[in-house]
């Protein structure tokens, strides 16, 4: 299973995601695909977000102690950090503070 959450994304990306995944809430997409398909979908998200103002996060089932893995792209204050095999979230400082 995988979950993708997008914010400030181009409408064409949201339409493309809706083709592959179920949009259960505005900007929140879920589905159950193979690793290969998941990587293709995430590549589409990364290409669409690019250097724009949007951001996205993907979480998927993985054989880890936590049972999942995740990745981010775009302008996001939350960045994944590996800490002895555990995925944690580091918050970047707010610019100007």
Describe the predicted segments one by one.
Residues 1-97:
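Basic nucleic-acid-binding interfaces
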